């Protein structure tokens, strides 16, 4: 079959990115909109802890998908993807209409609609890693990077939308000469939470439409021996040598694929297993840090330097994710040693941020421009480096086909869960970290 025309790969990259955008957009949108909804919901600022628990419980989606695969082996893999997408679209649409509804539970008012829909969306998002990723085994490895770019957009776009909305804007009143300064003055948002959730629904609709477009580009593969993945997209097509090279860590060498098949080499299989385990371990560890440990301390590490530092860290850190995916499209590290070195750089930046959070509300260089630059740069480097490692490790695992990508999705989700569980006691039970109040200077001596 002829190689794909120049327009088709570009369109496929775009559709894959939009498809990936729908993976975590719903839960990311809920997180960035919490400062708005807590003003009207009865849980107040206890609401984030409720959402954290619900997102952790959302990992039950992994069990549901596993059970479905056991009960219906060999069934169409599009079914769970469509279920996840429908849950996301319907959940955010209902959230836009019902988020402010409350009901009495055990004699107290609770935001039952908001919490129930947040749980449904958490189920869908957690299941996306083990449904969306295996589907990409039908595409050459370079499109996997577009998927992770889309996942980065699922965090960046809700952040940008919240900034346009005016989330978190406040003004400190002038301090009196003798006396305590008054409370900070909050600005009214430019549009309500319902509008935000409708916009989020539109993003998920676009993601579902992109998946349908991918299905049109990639009809079911014909029953031919090997190589073809769909119409116009081939692993073995001319010009695809780079795909074979980067997927080789988990693929059979060409010398063995052709001619007589030699007997199994136990040592080679052992090395192959060790390499795969290292890549999966890197995926689990990096996602534990970026999706569990570090988000729990972001406000503690940034807010002592001011709201501007916090917003810059959130937005630029989210932008670092898709930028790292762009970099991986051109330069992909295929060495375990190289990925390990990059991971150590990310751990160093993460350790600095954790130290700032522990020392909050009076970390080093507070009140200086250097402190703001360092904390923002550390967040950008940390999230960017770990995003690159995640994309590179997943690209190398792509050669193992659908089972390897399924294992990658499980590693990502399990790592995220372990990171979140590890941070729950120090943040919510033992209160190791201390926040800084707005318009107050506890470090002024």
Swiss-Prot record:
Pfam families reported for this sequence: SLC52_ribofla_tr
Positions with biased composition (Low complexity): 247-258
Keyword presence, Lipid metabolism: no
UniProt keyword Repressor, yes or no: no
Cellular component, GO, one term: plasma membrane
Substrates-to-products reaction catalysed: riboflavin(in) = riboflavin(out)
Membrane topology annotation: Multi-pass membrane protein
Transmembrane annotation, as ranges: 14-34, 47-67, 86-106, 112-132, 147-167, 196-216, 277-297, 312-332, 339-359, 366-386, 404-424
Keywords assigned by UniProt, alphabetized: Cell membrane, Deafness, Disease variant, Host cell receptor for virus entry, Membrane, Receptor, Transmembrane, Transmembrane helix, Transport
Effect upon mutating residue 52 to F: In BVVLS2; decreased riboflavin transport
Tissue and organ expression note: Highly expressed in brain, fetal brain and salivary gland. Weakly expressed in other tissues.
UniProt note on regulation of activity: Riboflavin transport is Na(+)-independent but moderately pH-sensitive. Activity is strongly inhibited by riboflavin analogs, such as lumiflavin. Weakly inhibited by flavin adenine dinucleotide (FAD) and flavin mononucleotide (FMN).
Similarity comment: family membership: Belongs to the riboflavin transporter family.
Summary of the function given for this chain in its UniProt record: Plasma membrane transporter mediating the uptake by cells of the water soluble vitamin B2/riboflavin that plays a key role in biochemical oxidation-reduction reactions of the carbohydrate, lipid, and amino acid metabolism. Humans are unable to synthesize vitamin B2/riboflavin and must obtain it via intestinal absorption. May also act as a receptor for 4-hydroxybutyrate. (Microbial infection) In case of infection by retroviruses, acts as a cell receptor to retroviral envelopes similar to the porcine endogenous retrovirus (PERV-A).
Protein name listed in UniProt: Solute carrier family 52, riboflavin transporter, member 2
The species this protein was found in: Homo sapiens (Human)
Gene: SLC52A2
């Amino acid at each position: 079959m002829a190689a794909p025309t120049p327009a088709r790969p570009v369109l496929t990259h775009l559709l894959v990115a939009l498809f990936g955008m729908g993976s975590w957009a719903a839960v990311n949108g809920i997180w960035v909109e919490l400062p708005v909804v807590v003003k009207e919901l009865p849980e107040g600022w206890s609401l984030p802890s409720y959402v954290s628990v619900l997102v952790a419980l959302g990992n039950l989606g992994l069990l549901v998908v596993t059970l479905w695969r056991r009960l219906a082996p060999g069934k169409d893999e599009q079914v769970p993807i469509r279920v996840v997408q429908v849950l996301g679209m319907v959940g955010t649409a209902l959230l836009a209409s019902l988020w402010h509804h409350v009901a009495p539970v055990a004699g107290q008012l609770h935001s039952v609609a908001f919490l129930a829909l947040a749980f449904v969306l958490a189920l869908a998002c957690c299941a996306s890693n083990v449904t969306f990723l295996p589907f990409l085994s039908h595409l050459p490895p370079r499109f996997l990077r577009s998927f992770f770019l889309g996942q980065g957009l699922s965090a960046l776009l809700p952040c940008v939308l919240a900034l346009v909305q005016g989330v978190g804007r406040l003004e400190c009143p002038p301090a009196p000469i003798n006396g305590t300064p008054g409370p900070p003055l909050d600005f009214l948002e430019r549009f309500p939470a319902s509008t935000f959730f409708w916009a989020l629904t539109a993003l998920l609709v676009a993601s579902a439409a992109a998946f349908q477009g991918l299905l049109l580009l990639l009809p079911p593969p014909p029953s031919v021996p090997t190589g073809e993945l769909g119409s116009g997209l081939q692993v073995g097509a001319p010009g695809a040598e780079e795909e074979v090279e980067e997927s080789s860590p988990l693929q059979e060498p060409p010398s063995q694929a052709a001619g007589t098949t030699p007997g199994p080499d136990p040592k080679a299989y052992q090395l192959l297993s060790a390499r795969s385990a290292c890549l999966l371990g890197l995926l689990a560890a990096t996602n534990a840090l970026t999706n569990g440990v570090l988000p729990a301390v972001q406000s503690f590490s940034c807010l002592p330097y001011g709201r501007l530092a916090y917003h810059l860290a959130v937005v630029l850190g989210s932008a670092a994710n898709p930028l790292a995916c762009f970099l991986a499209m051109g330069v992909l590290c295929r060495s375990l040693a190289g990925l390990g070195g990059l991971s150590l750089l990310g751990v160093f930046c993460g350790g600095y941020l954790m130290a700032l959070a522990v020392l909050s509300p009076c970390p080093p260089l507070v009140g200086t421009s250097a402190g703001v630059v360092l904390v923002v740069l550390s967040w950008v480097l940390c999230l960017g480096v770990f995003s690159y490692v995640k994309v590179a490790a997943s690209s190398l695992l792509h050669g193992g086909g659908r089972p390897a990508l399924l294992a990658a999705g499980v590693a990502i989700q399990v790592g995220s869960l372990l990171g979140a569980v590890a941070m729950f006691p120090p943040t919510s039970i033992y209160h190791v970290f201390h926040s800084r109040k707005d318009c107050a200077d506890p470090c002024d001596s």
